[in-house]
């Protein structure tokens, strides 16, 4: 397993699933858990169909859609490197966006569809008070304390 040096990832556990952190810690998830994580803190195995990789550029496009006062909420504090949201229903578009995120040669329409689907997945975490600080830490790692 290789550590991911990059931006962030969204993982979806259809069944029980284990993620390995860079520090060797194991995190266990149940079926229906949607995870947003700092990709540099996760070791990803070859089973990447459960992951959507989100680039810094895509995250930067997501931020302007948020209210300015939301961005000022404790952006400097230390936060967990991952967040979990339990979904009560299956996420039918997850496999499509996972496939699109692995493809490097997307047509323009596919790129726009991928971005829109990633924004929809990111919006699931908006009610979590730790989401925006984690998002800002991913974008500006020098702010970590």
Task: Report residues per predicted region.
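Residue-identity detector for glutamine
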Residues: 2, 41, 95, 99-102, ...
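Hydrophobic transmembrane alpha-helix bundles
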Residues: 38-39, 45-46, 62-66, 111-125, ...
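Residue-level signal for functionally critical sites in structured catalytic/ligand-binding pockets
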Residues: 8-10, 17-18, 109-120
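Short, Lys/Arg-enriched, Trp-marked, Pro/Gly-tolerant hinge/linker segments that flank
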Residues: 78-86, 104-114, 122-145
């Amino acid at each position: 397993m290789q550590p991911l040096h990059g931006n962030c990832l969204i993982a979806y556990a259809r069944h029980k699933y284990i993620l390995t952190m860079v520090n060797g810690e194991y995190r266990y998830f149940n079926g229906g858990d949607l995870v947003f994580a700092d990709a540099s803190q996760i070791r990803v195995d070859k089973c990447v169909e459960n992951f959507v990789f989100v680039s810094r550029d895509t995250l930067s496009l997501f931020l302007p859609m948020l209210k300015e006062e939301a961005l000022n909420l404790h952006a400097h504090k230390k936060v967990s490197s991952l967040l979990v949201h339990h979904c009560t229903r299956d996420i039918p578009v997850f496999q499509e966006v996972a496939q699109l995120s692995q493809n490097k040669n997307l047509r323009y329409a596919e790129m726009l569809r991928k971005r829109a689907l990633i924004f929809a997945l990111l919006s699931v975490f908006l009610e979590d008070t730790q989401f925006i600080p984690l998002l800002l830490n991913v974008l500006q790692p020098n702010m970590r304390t």
